[in-house]
A protein has these predicted regions:
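Histidine-dependent nucleotide/RNA phosphoesterase domain, centered on the 2H-phosphoesterase fold
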Residues: 1-175
Length: 175
């Protein structure tokens, strides 16, 4: 049986480092075996990896880097996430969902709310305290999406299956 696939946004190094540091500080260490990530699709069929890879190469070839804005914090009950907005990311995800619609699972058919989790599996009190601390100094900031990363789910850890960088030029040819 093939392993399910996960698709995430590849962020610029500065943003990735910022979220990773927060995750290292606030995620329970025994559960923190992944870097911070923004998941676009949670469970793609592993037996379609070749076709998915082809689609990602095609879509990323015509996609300029994306600007996302961290607009606030979201309570996860037992954790905290940064909420992000980007019309371009929403459009890209819609296009991929259109291509892969027949085999998307229930979680990937739900509404897409981009976020990066920096704490999870904590007590509700610990999560509430962290959210209040982060909220006290929060101001919106930009994150650059530079590509997409495909992963194989290994019952906990993830194994890299491919990285697809966005084009450095807009798809309409303008610079």
């Amino acid at each position: 049986m093939t392993r399910p696939l996960i698709l995430t946004l590849k962020m610029d190094d500065r943003s990735q480092g910022r979220f990773d540091r927060l995750r290292e500080l606030h995620f329970p260490p025994e559960r923190n075996y992944l870097n911070a990530h923004l998941t676009l699709f949670h469970k793609l069929p592993g037996d379609r990896e070749t076709g998915i890879s082809t689609d990602l190469q095609e879509v990323c070839r015509d996609q300029a880097p994306l600007t996302l804005t961290a607009t606030g914090l979201r309570s996860l009950g037992r954790g905290v996430a940064f909420e992000l907005t980007s019309p371009g990311l929403m459009s890209l995800r819609r296009e991929l969902a259109r291509r892969w619609g027949p085999w998307l699972g229930p979680q990937d058919r739900q509404g897409f709310k981009p976020h990066v989790t920096v704490q999870n599996k904590a007590s509700p009190e610990t999560a509430r305290t962290l959210r209040e601390q982060l909220q006290a100094t929060f101001s919106p900031f930009e994150v650059e999406g530079v590509g997409l990363s495909l992963w194989r789910y290994l019952d906990g850890p993830w194994e890299p299956a491919g990285t697809y960088l966005f084009s450095e030029r807009p798809k309409d040819g303008r610079t």
